[in-house]
């Protein structure tokens, strides 16, 4: 994927969603067609491929049985998006410090399960009785699709290769 320089100080949620959509589309188009530069509506230039025989034909190269396709991403593209921070996804050039747990019981948060606590306000009031959500930080290893913050169904990439190889 190639990208032109963007104003990194003005990254909005829409531009980041568009960036992630571009990454996903590059992975989908990767094995189908010869390279051709195309410009997306938000101004980012990406490299996509034209359909070979049929638009419905799917190439199986790069897809392992029972897993997801591996997507190659140029490191420079992620460097340009470095200032974006998301509470849900971390794009990093560094490998995680530890592998994901093999079983849920290995996860410390599962061992120390806490129920939601009731909040109390002064006086008699019915607002804010329960916490909206509990923060949970753990590895997800078995997801192939998810729902984004706007409620759209998205594909979860199994692996992203960084660099020129």
Swiss-Prot record:
Going by the UniProt record, its keywords in alphabetical order are: Cleavage on pair of basic residues, Glycoprotein, Growth factor, Secreted, Signal
* Signal peptide location: 1-3
**Cleaved propeptide residues:** 4-119
User: What cellular component terms from Gene Ontology apply here?
Assistant: axon; dendrite; extracellular space; synaptic vesicle
Query: Is Glycoprotein set as a keyword in this record?
Result: yes
User: Where in the cell does this protein reside?
Assistant: Secreted
GO process terms (BP):
cell surface receptor protein tyrosine kinase signaling pathway; modulation of chemical synaptic transmission; negative regulation of neuron apoptotic process; nerve development; nerve growth factor signaling pathway; neuron projection morphogenesis
Alphabetical list of Gene3D superfamilies matching this protein: Cystine-knot cytokines (2.10.90.10)
GO terms for molecular function, please? growth factor activity; nerve growth factor receptor binding
Q: Which Pfam families match?
A: NGF, NTF3_N
Q: Give the InterPro entries listed for this entry.
A: Cystine-knot_cytokine (IPR029034), Nerve_growth_factor-like (IPR020408), Nerve_growth_factor-rel (IPR002072), NTF3_N (IPR045815)
Query: Which residues bear sugar attachments?
Result: 112
Q: Does the keyword Signal apply?
A: yes
* Functional description taken from the UniProt entry: Seems to promote the survival of visceral and proprioceptive sensory neurons.
Tell me which family the UniProt entry assigns to this protein.
Belongs to the NGF-beta family.
Record-given protein name: Neurotrophin-3
Q: What is the primary gene name for this protein?
A: NTF3
